[in-house]
């Protein structure tokens, strides 16, 4: 890495969330975390990978994550792919780059098309938007992907022979009662190659209008490097089309229709409840962020909605009054009780030959961050770790900005991880779990799981790292960058879902990307419905508008600025930031 400064200790960041499998290897990405703060590591937080519960489905908050979460499997051809060779973290060499390989990850549904599925439409389709990690989305090599995210080396929508591409994509889910069955019927559906490849809707890369200012060691090693957060959104489409035969409705892809009813419908129901954040399902067990009796500050309650937008970097906002639930699909090699997923061939109408295969080394298995069936209350934020103390923000929160080698290659461009996240105890879910939803006991998404750290090749941390998707305020902390040398590290406000005025108008956030790609979305529709009404609106409509959530971005510019007035999209989004939707 060309390091020229003294290293006091080294933490390799192990991106355990992604499993890459070929005919010869299975490996995870290893990064280094360097700090010049003289301290020792917390031995209590390191050890063998946590033995979390697998193939276990409790009826608690973990059930909500289960309903929302899916196993993602990308089956790629191998071949020319400069990103893989540039990454140097998958065991890829010039000798094996042409071999077929598979990449596993986890994704969760949080939004979907605006219009409900019309059962009377013979060409019916359903499209959902699934959150996952950027380093998982990197494995999607769809020649028909949205132009902004299609690999540049394709040059057109039909890559030449010898170029790496995704041949087919499997959507999977653990079925507690039917995980090991081989009969081809809807009840045993656990892993299905879909008739359409996913597409990329959003990646958290270069999302600011101006490049962040990095501390000197990082800027010196990587001049001009841009920012990323390990978050992406993929669109997954199910073909629900049908025709009449002998007086009966026959679906073209019956398995996808069954998948929609068996998996997607429950996922949408849970997501709707979390967005509403009301009713018995969504009442926290204890009042969130309860202040001490002698604390004169006002309680800061979470915003209503799917995502937790509380400012947990504020030391006056408690990190102790909620638990964090994680559930994902780690890949297990030689796992003693390996779940062998049933795999079906895509019907012949897809015109792709998809083999029915079984991997003796294992398949992804549903796993949660619970150590035994009697302790299902989630895990707390690990407040006593050197990882958070070196970051300077507060105990329990890591600072990705100063993690010198928290880097990633996406589409042959190297990025540096930005922002901050949470350190969750006993939450190392191992390979394949990248992209898992971190749900709090307040029934909101705290962020997205992407990995853990390791002090050496054999000693991983027991905690997991969850990237924050939201930073409401400018954060400035002093960090040590050399012997008796201090610098100010600044993390600007960001909001990966809604965006803010510091972020680009086209692809800076999920909502802005939807607008740019001209895609429909239930969330986007609700946002528009909650925008202030034009002249002539009734008092009732105005009152309804006044009840919407307000953005907490302190750096927001005046919406009447020249730049905003010249850009219709920016004008619309400027209203969105100030009028976040009320889901009641």
Curated annotation (Swiss-Prot):
Residues 530-570 are annotated as: Disordered. Keywords: Cell membrane, Lipoprotein, Membrane, Palmitate, Signal. Residues 538-552 have a biased composition (Low complexity). Residues 553-565 have a biased composition (Basic and acidic residues). It comes from the Bacteria. A lipid is attached at residue 28 (N-palmitoyl cysteine). A lipid is attached at residue 28 (S-diacylglycerol cysteine). GO terms for cellular component: plasma membrane. It is a lipid-anchor. Its main location: membrane. Residues 1-27 form the signal peptide. It is found in: Cell membrane. Belongs to the MG067/MG068/MG395 family. This is Uncharacterized lipoprotein MYCGA2980. It comes from Mycoplasmoides gallisepticum (strain R(low / passage 15 / clone 2)) (Mycoplasma gallisepticum).
